[in-house]
């Protein structure tokens, strides 16, 4: 337990919290070729690789992912939610933060129904999360 004199000389430091989606915290100025300090809720990028990976124990599946080069020149791995997708190399995608618990290193989600990513076909529930239009009556 510090004395009051010690606290006067050197106050307590507040904890610095680390971002869970660091690639969204920076922009890029292509004229100056420098990173800028403007954060964004989503970022646009180009898929450089699309594939599947297996989750950690005890789960078993083939989870779809895309490696994305963002507009700020960061390269990140993003999860493709929903059943089926139309993404391939050079597709333009929009990503948001949000990790996938059983895929190590996947901290971002691709937003379905935005840019080149199509919504999930035949989806009836939670349609807004998967970019699906309302069914015809």
Curated annotation (Swiss-Prot):
Keywords: Methylation, Ribonucleoprotein, Ribosomal protein, RNA-binding, rRNA-binding, tRNA-binding. CDD domains: Ribosomal_S12. GO terms for molecular function: rRNA binding; structural constituent of ribosome; tRNA binding. Residues 9-18 have a biased composition (Basic residues). The keyword tRNA-binding applies. GO terms for cellular component: small ribosomal subunit. GO terms for biological process: translation. InterPro entries: NA-bd_OB-fold, Ribosomal_uS12, Ribosomal_uS12_bac. The modification 3-methylthioaspartic acid is found at residue 102. It holds the Pfam family Ribosom_S12_S23. Residues 1-22, 35-57 are annotated as: Disordered. Coiled coil: none annotated. It comes from the Bacteria. Belongs to the universal ribosomal protein uS12 family. NCBIfam families: rpsL_bact. With S4 and S5 plays an important role in translational accuracy. Interacts with and stabilizes bases of the 16S rRNA that are involved in tRNA selection in the A site and with the mRNA backbone. Located at the interface of the 30S and 50S subunits, it traverses the body of the 30S subunit contacting proteins on the other side and probably holding the rRNA structure together. The combined cluster of proteins S8, S12 and S17 appears to hold together the shoulder and platform of the 30S subunit. Part of the 30S ribosomal subunit. Contacts proteins S8 and S17. May interact with IF1 in the 30S initiation complex. This is Small ribosomal subunit protein uS12. It comes from Leuconostoc mesenteroides subsp. mesenteroides (strain ATCC 8293 / DSM 20343 / BCRC 11652 / CCM 1803 / JCM 6124 / NCDO 523 / NBRC 100496 / NCIMB 8023 / NCTC 12954 / NRRL B-1118 / 37Y). The lineage of its organism: Bacteria, Bacillati, Bacillota, Bacilli, Lactobacillales.
């Amino acid at each position: 337990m510090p004395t009051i004199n010690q606290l006067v000389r050197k106050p307590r430091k507040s904890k610095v919290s680390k971002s869970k989606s660091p690639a969204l915290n920076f922009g890029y100025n292509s004229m100056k070729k420098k990173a800028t300090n403007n954060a964004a809720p989503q970022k646009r990028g180009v898929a450089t690789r699309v594939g599947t990976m297996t989750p950690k124990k005890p789960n078993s599946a083939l989870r779809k992912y895309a490696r994305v080069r963002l507009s700020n020149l960061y390269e990140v791995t993003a999860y493709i939610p929903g059943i089926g997708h139309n993404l391939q190399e050079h597709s333009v995608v929009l990503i948001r933060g949000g990790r996938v618990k059983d895929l190590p290193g996947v901290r971002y989600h691709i937003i379905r129904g935005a840019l080149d990513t199509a919504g999930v076909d035949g989806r009836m529930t939670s349609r807004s999360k998967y970019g699906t239009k309302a069914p015809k009556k």
